């Protein structure tokens, strides 16, 4: 594939390049102004000299000569500065990119990648030899995989033979391009070997394995043929015909079973004696009739004289060349019109007769897939035959280095072995083709060359991978790109940048939804320039060096036991961090919520604390996952982080629109642990409490355990308290002297007076369930009661189902300002009822007041 880069005008440059360019521009402007001034002076003096019309050397003439020399010098400086500026302007910067377009590369473009024109006019870049370096001189072999003529010199400004060294400059100080007359190597910087490519001209074309073996196979979809048939043609196990014929359809000529087909192929003429006749008398009548019927077709018949003979126009080909011919003969516009017509007929049939059958649906999806692929080729103006490779690009040598080890041995990358494999088979095929070798041998070499290129692109995709001497699969180009250790995720997406950190994430039970716990040591390093600036502003440190020394000592002693000056440093850090958003990212960033903004909360330790509700968006858990921290520097970036990327502003999934902030991870585990029973602890079933608040007091005083089984007086209804099956079958009934009765059940107890009226009831529960119930009632008191439901039904008469109410709230969420959304929805965040307790509950501050909910509902009519 090839990439096309579009650049904006004027280009946006990095700060360093901008400063350098500005310096050059300023120097050019200064030189230009001085030259203009000198030119004016020289013009005035020239007028004086011309008026005198004298050849004598007067002071004015001397002054004129001096000024003119200075003007020439200034013009030279101006020219040099402009050349440097134009040269600097040609330097490519990644910030100049506006977009990147990928498409299939043509053979001509691939050759242009590796072809380079030397100053003497000679073009180099084609690799023809499989050798890497000379093991006697330890220098790269010419025309090999490390050729200095094609990729540039190994040493700066030194040729291959060593006869030409150094760089020559012209009068303006610009290096003169030179080429060694003996070895033909261009003298320049050796860094060019890191980005200069080469190419291999293949004697026989090969099919790109990604387009053949992918799912679905792009070649199969485009040619409308099964992948197995294309693989058989590509790997030279079957021929491709230029046109179909009935002679190739045995089922049409001989519609028989497979067993008879085998007997037909092996039939021979022979005479049977009487013994054979007696033996074959037991054959079934159907078998005899079939043999007689088909025997007439199988018998040889001579050609009658006078019949016209014609040559079969079909042509047979094999290998990638056959695939290329079929792709070249494909008319994309005609095929697109035919496919559109067939698709229109199928859609009309579906509209007229109802649902299509399964076969018609498969055919319809197949037509759509092929039509989309053809449209892609037409839009990108790419040719289908470019999927067959004729020129193979070669990576720069510094990206596949070869290193000398101790003892005279060499270590190299696997790509060099794969390139050597391709070159050896390509050169051998060329020799056999010139020798007019047998067709069988040529066919075998075609298959070997195809397999060598397959191993270079994606080793092991076809089946058995190419192994090295230690039976280890060689690492191909695809292996260097894909996976966690590949070029994209490891070196591009996962590379280290300034003002960033990385650490393990743990749950933060006391955090709010938009907060995260940031270790103090990490925060001090990330915000170091801002902390130093504030220390200097507060006159805590006289200079930058002393401020760094204070910070270093504060980190060395740790934030647990700080001294007075350390406390000043940590207080300064807290002042800097307050209200400053940070970005958290978890790789791989598969969607928008993979990176979100949080307000940092300084904590001790070295792990980042994260809110459990945002784990779904990050697809994170707390089993050792790591996350990266990034600091937005500019005011625009901080504003974007606060207004758009804050976690409390991203409550809905961008893909489905459903809430993505749902309880998970430690929240669910904490609720389960809080409400579970533990029958193995000390029995406390004899304890009775008059209210829920008494249970909480006893728990905080340590009189009962979190999982203790207790009896609590309950004023409301309990589950099953009015059920007939419980009232009819009590475990025990007690009656006191006053006529009061106790009805004891397994989960609750009911007390009645002498008239049968219910006096009180006790339920059997645990301390944790009481705590959980209190938390729910304490922090969700804004729940939709009857009055709020009436208001919803007034505004939405048809909204009587929970999904309708949910859609109403989602619509309400989308209609309001960003800052109002968290308060309006009031989603929970985890916490603990008291320090050291294993419970998760939503803090009260994260919920909206019931009056706010009513106010938002009243504003619905403004839509």
UniProtKB/Swiss-Prot annotation:
<keyword id="KW-0934">Plastid</keyword>
<comment type="function">
    <text>DNA-dependent RNA polymerase catalyzes the transcription of DNA into RNA using the four ribonucleoside triphosphates as substrates.</text>
</comment>
<dbReference type="Pfam" id="PF04997">
    <property type="entry name" value="RNA_pol_Rpb1_1"/>
</dbReference>
<keyword id="KW-0150">Chloroplast</keyword>
<dbReference type="GO" id="GO:0008270">
    <property type="term" value="F:zinc ion binding"/>
</dbReference>
<dbReference type="GO" id="GO:0000287">
    <property type="term" value="F:magnesium ion binding"/>
</dbReference>
<dbReference type="GO" id="GO:0006351">
    <property type="term" value="P:DNA-templated transcription"/>
</dbReference>
<feature type="binding site">
    <location>
        <position position="623"/>
    </location>
    <ligand>
        <name>Mg(2+)</name>
    </ligand>
</feature>
<keyword id="KW-0548">Nucleotidyltransferase</keyword>
<feature type="binding site">
    <location>
        <position position="183"/>
    </location>
    <ligand>
        <name>Zn(2+)</name>
    </ligand>
</feature>
<comment type="subunit">
    <text>In plastids the minimal PEP RNA polymerase catalytic core is composed of four subunits: alpha, beta, beta', and beta''. When a (nuclear-encoded) sigma factor is associated with the core the holoenzyme is formed, which can initiate transcription.</text>
</comment>
<dbReference type="GO" id="GO:0003899">
    <property type="term" value="F:DNA-directed RNA polymerase activity"/>
</dbReference>
<feature type="binding site">
    <location>
        <position position="625"/>
    </location>
    <ligand>
        <name>Mg(2+)</name>
    </ligand>
</feature>
<keyword id="KW-0460">Magnesium</keyword>
<dbReference type="InterPro" id="IPR007066">
    <property type="entry name" value="RNA_pol_Rpb1_3"/>
</dbReference>
<feature type="binding site">
    <location>
        <position position="180"/>
    </location>
    <ligand>
        <name>Zn(2+)</name>
    </ligand>
</feature>
<feature type="binding site">
    <location>
        <position position="159"/>
    </location>
    <ligand>
        <name>Zn(2+)</name>
    </ligand>
</feature>
<keyword id="KW-0808">Transferase</keyword>
<dbReference type="InterPro" id="IPR042102">
    <property type="entry name" value="RNA_pol_Rpb1_3_sf"/>
</dbReference>
<keyword id="KW-0862">Zinc</keyword>
<dbReference type="Pfam" id="PF00623">
    <property type="entry name" value="RNA_pol_Rpb1_2"/>
</dbReference>
<dbReference type="GO" id="GO:0000428">
    <property type="term" value="C:DNA-directed RNA polymerase complex"/>
</dbReference>
<dbReference type="InterPro" id="IPR000722">
    <property type="entry name" value="RNA_pol_asu"/>
</dbReference>
<keyword id="KW-0479">Metal-binding</keyword>
<dbReference type="InterPro" id="IPR007080">
    <property type="entry name" value="RNA_pol_Rpb1_1"/>
</dbReference>
<feature type="compositionally biased region" description="Polar residues">
    <location>
        <begin position="23"/>
        <end position="36"/>
    </location>
</feature>
<dbReference type="InterPro" id="IPR034678">
    <property type="entry name" value="RNApol_RpoC1"/>
</dbReference>
<feature type="binding site">
    <location>
        <position position="621"/>
    </location>
    <ligand>
        <name>Mg(2+)</name>
    </ligand>
</feature>
<feature type="region of interest" description="Disordered">
    <location>
        <begin position="1"/>
        <end position="83"/>
    </location>
</feature>
<dbReference type="GO" id="GO:0009507">
    <property type="term" value="C:chloroplast"/>
</dbReference>
<dbReference type="GO" id="GO:0005739">
    <property type="term" value="C:mitochondrion"/>
</dbReference>
<keyword id="KW-0804">Transcription</keyword>
<dbReference type="InterPro" id="IPR045867">
    <property type="entry name" value="DNA-dir_RpoC_beta_prime"/>
</dbReference>
<comment type="similarity">
    <text>Belongs to the RNA polymerase beta' chain family. RpoC1 subfamily.</text>
</comment>
<protein>
    <recommendedName>
        <fullName>DNA-directed RNA polymerase subunit beta'</fullName>
        <ecNumber>2.7.7.6</ecNumber>
    </recommendedName>
</protein>
<dbReference type="Pfam" id="PF04983">
    <property type="entry name" value="RNA_pol_Rpb1_3"/>
</dbReference>
<dbReference type="GO" id="GO:0003677">
    <property type="term" value="F:DNA binding"/>
</dbReference>
<keyword id="KW-0240">DNA-directed RNA polymerase</keyword>
<feature type="binding site">
    <location>
        <position position="161"/>
    </location>
    <ligand>
        <name>Zn(2+)</name>
    </ligand>
</feature>
<dbReference type="InterPro" id="IPR006592">
    <property type="entry name" value="RNA_pol_N"/>
</dbReference>
<dbReference type="InterPro" id="IPR044893">
    <property type="entry name" value="RNA_pol_Rpb1_clamp_domain"/>
</dbReference>
């Amino acid at each position: 594939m090839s990439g096309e880069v579009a650049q904006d005008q004027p280009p946006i440059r990095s700060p360093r390049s901008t400063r350098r360019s500005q310096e050059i521009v300023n120097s050019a402007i200064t030189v230009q102004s001085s030259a203009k001034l000198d030119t004016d002076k020289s013009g005035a003096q020239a007028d004086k000299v011309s008026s005198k019309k004298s050849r004598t050397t007067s002071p004015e003439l001397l002054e004129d000569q001096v000024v003119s020399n200075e003007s020439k010098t200034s013009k030279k400086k101006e020219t040099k500065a402009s050349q440097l500026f134009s040269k600097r302007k040609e330097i490519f910067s990644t910030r100049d990119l506006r977009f990147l377009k990928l498409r299939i590369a043509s053979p001509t473009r691939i050759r242009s990648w590796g072809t380079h024109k030397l100053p003497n006019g000679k073009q180099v870049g084609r690799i023809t030899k499989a050798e890497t370096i000379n093991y006697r001189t330890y220098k790269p072999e010419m025309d090999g995989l490390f050729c200095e003529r094609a990729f540039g010199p190994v040493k700066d400004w030194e040729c291959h033979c060593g006869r030409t060294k150094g760089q020559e400059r012209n009068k303006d100080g610009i290096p003169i391009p030179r080429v060694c007359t003996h070895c033909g190597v261009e003298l320049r910087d050796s860094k060019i070997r890191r980005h200069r490519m080469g190419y291999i001209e293949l004697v026989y074309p090969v099919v790109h394995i990604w387009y053949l073996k992918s799912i679905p196979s792009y070649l199969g979809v485009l040619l409308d043929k099964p992948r197995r048939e294309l693989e058989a043609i590509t790997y030279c196990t079957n021929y491709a015909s230029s046109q179909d014929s009935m002679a190739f359809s045995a089922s049409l000529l001989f519609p028989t079973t497979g067993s008879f087909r085998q007997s037909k192929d092996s039939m021979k003429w022979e005479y049977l004696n009487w013994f054979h006749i007696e033996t074959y008398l037991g054959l079934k009548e159907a078998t005899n009739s079939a043999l007689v019927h088909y025997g007439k077709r199988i018998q040889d018949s001579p050609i009658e004289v006078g019949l016209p003979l014609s040559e079969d126009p079909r042509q047979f080909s094999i290998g990638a060349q056959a695939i290329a011919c079929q792709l070249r003969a494909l008319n994309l516009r005609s095929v697109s019109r035919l496919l559109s017509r067939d698709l229109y007929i199928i859609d009309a049939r579906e509209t007229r007769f109802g649902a299509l059958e399964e076969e018609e649906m498969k055919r319809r999806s197949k037509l759509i897939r092929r039509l989309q692929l053809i449209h892609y080729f037409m839009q990108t103006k790419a040719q289908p035959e470019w999927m067959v490779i004729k020129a193979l690009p070669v990576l720069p040598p510094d990206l596949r280095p070869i290193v000398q080890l101790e003892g005279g041995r060499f270590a190299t990358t696997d790509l060099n072995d794969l390139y050597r494999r391709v070159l050896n088979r390509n050169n051998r095929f060329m020799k056999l083709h010139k020798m007019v070798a047998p067709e069988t041998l040529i066919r075998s070499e075609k298959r070997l060359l195809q397999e060598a290129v397959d191993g270079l692109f994606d080793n092991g995709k076809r089946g058995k991978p190419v192994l090295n001497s230690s039976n280890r699969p060689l690492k191909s180009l695809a292996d260097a790109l894909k996976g966690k250790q590949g070029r994209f995720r490891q070196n591009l997406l996962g590379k280290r940048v300034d003002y960033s950190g990385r650490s393990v994430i743990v749950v933060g039970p006391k955090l709010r939804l938009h907060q995260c716990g940031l270790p103090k040591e990490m925060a001090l390093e990330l915000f170091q320039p801002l902390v130093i600036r504030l220390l200097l502003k507060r006159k805590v440190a006289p200079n930058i060096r002393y401020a760094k020394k204070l910070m270093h000592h504060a980190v060395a002693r740790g934030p647990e036991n700080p001294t007075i000056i350390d406390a000043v440093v940590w207080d300064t850090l807290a002042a800097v961090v307050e209200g400053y958003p940070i970005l958290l990212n978890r790789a791989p960033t598969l969607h928008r919520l993979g990176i979100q903004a949080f307000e940092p909360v300084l904590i001790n330790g070295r792990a980042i604390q994260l809110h459990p509700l945002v784990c779904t968006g990050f697809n994170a858990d707390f089993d050792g996952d790591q996350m990266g921290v990034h600091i937005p520097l500019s005011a625009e970036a901080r504003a974007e982080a606060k207004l758009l990327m804050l976690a409390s502003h991203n409550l809905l999934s961008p893909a489905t629109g459903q809430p993505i902030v749902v309880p998970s991870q430690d929240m669910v585990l904490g609720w389960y642990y809080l409400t579970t029973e533990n029958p193995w602890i000390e029995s406390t079933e004899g304890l009775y409490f008059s209210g829920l608040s008494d249970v909480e007091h006893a728990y905080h005083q340590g009189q009962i355990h979190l999982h203790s089984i207790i009896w609590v007086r309950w004023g409301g209804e309990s589950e099953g308290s009015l059920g007939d099956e419980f009232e009819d079958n009590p475990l025990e009934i007690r009656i006191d002297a006053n006529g009061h009765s106790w009805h004891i059940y397994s989960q609750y107890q009911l007390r009645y007076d002498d008239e049968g009226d219910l006096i009180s009831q006790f339920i059997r529960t645990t301390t944790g369930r009481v705590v959980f119930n209190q938390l729910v009632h304490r922090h969700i008191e804004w729940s939709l009661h009857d009055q709020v439901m009436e208001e919803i039904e007034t505004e939405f008469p048809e909204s009587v189902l929970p999904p309708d109410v949910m859609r109403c709230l989602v619509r309400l969420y989308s209609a309001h300002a960003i800052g109002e959304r968290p308060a309006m929805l009031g989603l929970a965040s985890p916490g603990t009822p008291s320090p050291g307790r294993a419970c998760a509950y939503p803090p009260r501050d994260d919920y909206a007041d019931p009056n706010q909910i009513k106010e938002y509902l009243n504003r619905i009519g403004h839509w």
